[in-house]
Amino acid sequence: MGSKDLFQRGSSLFPMGVNSPVRYFKDYPFYVDNASGSRIYDVDGNEYIDYCLAYGPSILGHADPDVVRAVRDQAEKGLIYGAPSEAEIRLGDIIRRSSKNIEMMRFTNSGTEATMHAIRLARAYTGRSIIVKMEGGFHGAHDYSLIRSGSGTLTFGSPSSPGVPEEVARTVVVGRYNDEANIRNIFSQYGSRIAAVITEPIMGNAGVITPEPGFLEFLRDITQKNGSLLIFDEVITGYRFAFSPYQDIIGIRPDLTTMGKIIGGGMPIGLFGGSADIMKKVSPSGDVYQSGTFSGNPVTMAAGFAALKKLQGMDYASLVRRTEKLMNGIDDILAKRKIRHVVNGYRSMFQFFFAESAKNYDEVMKADRDLYFRIFKRLMNHGVYVPPSQFETNFVSFAHSDDDISKTIEAFDLSVGEAAK
């Protein structure tokens, strides 16, 4: 059965035939049969070089044999116990040893859960209620994340999804990423009521937006001066650029960190952690409640440990070289055709925008979405899969070869030529 038929069947079961909106695109999404290494194969018999990589977890490539073996071995010993196991100790230990700032942690089942619990913990620890998030920053699908700015930079956010109560939105203030003056104004008005600022240190859910020099240091300074916590959402960036969270690369110590994706080796996972002083407020050692039937389940723990153990010896510089080659190739092709564009990226993640600039959410939202989608569809015709939306991120994995990069550049050149006609 092909993708079109499966989509018709799926549409009677799931809203628009999918279980996450990012997987849908017109006229219908492709349905995957299997994936291996840098390749993903659909049920229609097509093969693609994959740069979506499940939106970030698959840094080793699809179906890494060491991770698959670890999952199989653990599954034979039991899928879930409802009790602690050594598997969670092993994964927690390798994360703590490779992070300068995470003294204690708690595993969850998704990045959404991790940020939700981190926000609750920050409010409990500070005794304050207001959370500051960045416009366009994505921290999962819970109510406190699904907030966008109102008409003014100092107004409380309004819900960006029906079902989020206005009362919830009033506890979230939306700031502008890379805009120090805006954040200062927010603190001048609400400083004594702000529990925490939560931000992706590199925004990865509005395409890729990198921090301007000094911006993250500024956030650290202003939160400390006002008695607020700083939460880094490293669900995407944790272990993406080095064998550590991104915060260790730049030398900034947040109070709390959330992670996910890569640390699960492809299995569902989330984590929130930080100093022991803050984390000891989590139940049962403290009174901030958090739980989950599948939290710390042994199969996920085994997959995550196998992935991180393998990453520990990997050459991250090779990812940078291949990503830069691909970014430069894309930039050259678009410049040659005199197409207005920006290619944003950091080490092994990148995105291309058809805009004058892409330094913040407002600029990104002005990009030409139609041109991006036309190129996306043609790239698929030429055997390359990138995210259907330019507001997502491309990733390069250790499974991508130099030949993959060269083939992708060739496909991009053809696709741009076809889309620009």
Curated annotation (Swiss-Prot):
InterPro entries: 4pyrrol_synth_GluAld_NH2Trfase, Aminotrans_3, Aminotrans_3_PPA_site, PyrdxlP-dep_Trfase, PyrdxlP-dep_Trfase_major, PyrdxlP-dep_Trfase_small. It comes from the Archaea. The keyword Kinase does not apply. GO terms for molecular function: glutamate-1-semialdehyde 2,1-aminomutase activity; pyridoxal phosphate binding; transaminase activity. It is an enzyme of class 5 (isomerase). Its EC number is 5.4.3.8. It catalyses: (S)-4-amino-5-oxopentanoate = 5-aminolevulinate. The modification N6-(pyridoxal phosphate)lysine is found at residue 261. Keywords: Cytoplasm, Isomerase, Porphyrin biosynthesis, Pyridoxal phosphate. It is found in: Cytoplasm. One of its GO terms (biological process) is protoporphyrinogen IX biosynthetic process. Its cofactor is pyridoxal 5'-phosphate. NCBIfam families: hemL, PRK00062.1. Belongs to the class-III pyridoxal-phosphate-dependent aminotransferase family. HemL subfamily. This is Glutamate-1-semialdehyde 2,1-aminomutase. The gene is hemL.
